[in-house]
Amino acid sequence: MSKLNPYFGEYGGMYVPQILMPALKQLETAFIEAQEDESFQQEFTELLKNYAGRPTALTLTRNLSPNPLTKIYLKREDLLHGGAHKTNQVLGQALLAKRMGKKEIIAETGAGQHGVATALACALLGLKCKVYMGAKDVERQSPNVFRMKLMGAEVIPVTSGSATLKDACNEAMRDWSGSYDKAHYLLGTAAGPHPFPTIVREFQRMIGEETKSQILEREGRLPDAVIACVGGGSNAIGMFADFIDEEEVALIGVEPAGKGIDTPMHGAPLKHGKTGIFFGMKAPLMQDSEGQIEESYSVSAGLDFPSVGPQHAHLAATGRATYESATDDEALEAFQLLARSEGIIPALESAHALAYAVKLAKEATKETILVVNLSGRGDKDIFTVADILEQQKVEQQEAEQQQTNNQNN
């Protein structure tokens, strides 16, 4: 049985304590066997169709495009059960865990979407569920915390470091190193030690496969570009995987530029990172001059990650994919724009991809087809956005008042 390549070019690998090597090797073997097992594939496909609601729609937007030459399609992962693309690969990994005889699932979550997806899969498949979540994220994503608990998950707030996603990842990995005989670590993104980046890509691959057949049916040709937001990179690699060999299709990932790419407040390791070892892999990483991990920042909890999946690093290095960025303000604008123009409220993560797509659409000089992976819905973000908009309103009023005072003096 052939083993999988742990590297994508120079990126990837298995940089973990020796104690975890048997667990990762066992996982790799189980995954290879499952990929070749017709009954496993059948059960996975059946769950995706009849439980999760696949295939998801490919929606041509009516009013979003600012340019009559550009059509913008949305791949509607927001319509999936659980509210985001996360459900796809979580069902795959949970089935894999059962196949390996594991009784317990350990997971980490940022925005809470991966935690919710893990909780629903565990409830469905009768597995015990433990979710590590940065204390800061527990606070800003309370609806998802309640959803997880409602479905029987134990949510553990992590207070170390910046109390966000990277710290939750570290705690989850630490827990797993002491319990892998009975527990499976259900990693939520296409990053981490081998074989996780490959497993997650293969369990998200249907996003791009469906998109390809749907767009060919609708337009009779492939799109000019597929666009997806990138934190760790699972929704993007799921969209890109089936298009990598289609050279005429541009692959565009959009990282969070936060308060601005030139400030310390962003989460764009592909643009501004240096290669380092983090979370069991070799990948671009936000580091300071002493090599310490810098805190990443994004208005969207799910993109708040200081590194990126190794295959994205390789696609960037070879030039097959390009990686742009969108600021908090651009994402907030796109969030509102989609709601107003199409009646669809996107996740703040997905809004980063939308922001760049609208920018790209404006520049088109010939007929252009863009597909945006709408990776999740925005219910979880409405209170965050409401608070920010209220704050902006107050600041604007104060600035106007100040201006009036200055004119009167």
Swiss-Prot record:
Q: Which cofactor does it need?
A: pyridoxal 5'-phosphate
Q: Which CDD domains does this UniProt record tie to the protein? A: Trp-synth_B
Listed InterPro entries: Trp_synth_b_CS, Trp_synth_beta, Trp_synth_beta/beta-like, TrpB-like_PALP, TrpB-like_PALP_sf
Could you tell me the EC number(s) of this protein?
A: 4.2.1.20
Q: Which Gene3D superfamilies match?
A: 3.40.50.1100
Q: In which pathway does it act?
A: Amino-acid biosynthesis; L-tryptophan biosynthesis; L-tryptophan from chorismate: step 5/5
Under catalytic activity, the entry for this protein gives: (1S,2R)-1-C-(indol-3-yl)glycerol 3-phosphate + L-serine = D-glyceraldehyde 3-phosphate + L-tryptophan + H2O
Family as reported in the entry's similarity comment: Belongs to the TrpB family.
Q: How does it assemble?
A: Tetramer of two alpha and two beta chains.
This protein is called Tryptophan synthase beta chain
